[in-house]
Regions:
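Lipolytic serine-hydrolase domain surface
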Residues: 1-25, 45-209
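Gly/Ala-rich beta-loop-alpha elbow adjacent to hydrolase catalytic centers
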Residues: 30-39
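Short, hydrophobic alpha-helix immediately C-terminal to the catalytic nucleophile
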Residues: 40-44
């Protein structure tokens, strides 16, 4: 709570400094883990127009009870939650941490896909924290979403993400059509027996001897 007013003044200073120099920029505040709760509490303290977007990820709580408290336009408050291995997400009680961002009405939900992280692990326990630090890792869809928003854009669509993965060689035609592997990489056990004169391909009456 003590840090929230300081963060609000800092963000206001960034905006005031830019305005004084005639510099226009998209100011996106990103808050991770407990820092997202502090950020969430600071946004209502800021002067209107200080920030353009607010993104929470791996957040235990939004810092507010209602999205209107942020004073940001509709569609400019986001949350990202990896579905596995982040026990911090939504951990805090609403009374002190604010509403779980995933349940905050009116929020824009970003992809929580962190599987591209080199450190990604498949969570084996309900309280696993293994992927809590993976959101900003290179190669994740979460980091791509953040980059888009920071640049003044929107979250990555499924089509855009697939195209990007394809361009980087991470998605191939085999990934889209796994059944093709059967024909391109035949298993010896599945190799059909040699044809005989009375069992030629295409003969509906063919029988293997």
């Amino acid at each position: 709570d003590r840090a929230a007013p300081k963060l609000a003044r800092f963000e206001e200073g960034l905006r005031a400094s830019a305005d004084a120099r005639g510099h226009q920029f998209t100011n996106t505040l990103l808050g991770h883990s407990y820092g997202s709760t502090t950020s969430g509490k600071s946004v209502p303290m800021m002067a209107a127009g200080t920030i353009d977007n607010f993104v929470m990820f791996g957040s235990p709580g939004s810092g507010v009870r209602n999205i209107d408290a942020y004073g940001l336009p509709e569609g400019h408050v986001y949350e990202s939650s990896t579905p596995y291995g982040d026990a911090v997400q939504g951990l805090g009680p609403d009374a002190s941490y604010g509403t779980n961002p995933r349940k905050l009405e009116g929020i824009t939900h970003l992809s929580g896909d962190t599987t591209g992280s080199a450190n990604y692990t498949v969570a084996t326990g309900a309280l696993s924290f293994d992927n809590h630090m993976s959101y900003f890792d290179e190669g994740t869809r979460t980091s791509q979403d953040f980059a888009n928003i920071i640049a003044g854009g929107k979250q990555t669509t499924d089509e855009e993400w697939e195209a990007l993965q394809t361009a980087q060689g991470k998605i191939t035609e085999l990934d889209r059509n796994p059944w093709m592997k059967r024909y391109m990489e035949p298993n010896e056990a599945e190799t059909p027996p040699p044809t005989t004169p009375d069992s030629m391909p295409g003969d509906p009456l063919a029988r293997h001897s």
